[in-house]
Amino acid sequence: MSMSDPIADMLTRIRNGQQAQKVSVSMPCSKLKVAIAKVLQDEGYIDGYSIREAGGKPELDVALKYYAGRPVIERIERVSRPGLRVYKGSGDLPRVMNGLGVAIVSTPRGVMTDRAARAGRVGGEVICYVA
């Protein structure tokens, strides 16, 4: 049976892994998941990610990050979901925690943060909020 929302599954695995103080979490790989992991790494929310073959299928390993024994990601939540897609123009993109967090946005120019999308004057689908 196929998964209805693989991105929500990815975010839940990261959230649960950090609550359990895991070093890393693994999940099935896709181009969108890799792009989201790259944004999280660039913003300093995770230590890194790698792609490995497991049983003939690619797996994405995400190395979680902690500071003083606490998870760096305090909140990670899905915004746009299969039942209710959320699209915003460049001027309407939300500011997460008044600029302290990021919104990850899928745009025609690729997956990027809300700040990069605003600077490039491009809108898109708001995938999730991270703080």
From Swiss-Prot:
The keyword rRNA-binding applies. SUPFAM superfamilies: Ribosomal protein S8 (SSF56047). One of its GO terms (cellular component) is ribonucleoprotein complex. The keyword RNA-binding applies. GO terms for biological process: translation. Keywords: Ribonucleoprotein, Ribosomal protein, RNA-binding, rRNA-binding. PROSITE patterns: RIBOSOMAL_S8 (PS00053). GO terms for molecular function: rRNA binding; structural constituent of ribosome. It holds the Pfam family Ribosomal_S8. Belongs to the universal ribosomal protein uS8 family. NCBIfam families: PRK00136.1. Part of the 30S ribosomal subunit. Contacts proteins S5 and S12. One of the primary rRNA binding proteins, it binds directly to 16S rRNA central domain where it helps coordinate assembly of the platform of the 30S subunit. PANTHER family: 40S RIBOSOMAL PROTEIN S15A. This is Small ribosomal subunit protein uS8. It comes from Aromatoleum aromaticum (strain DSM 19018 / LMG 30748 / EbN1) (Azoarcus sp. (strain EbN1)). The lineage of its organism: Bacteria, Pseudomonadati, Pseudomonadota, Betaproteobacteria, Rhodocyclales.
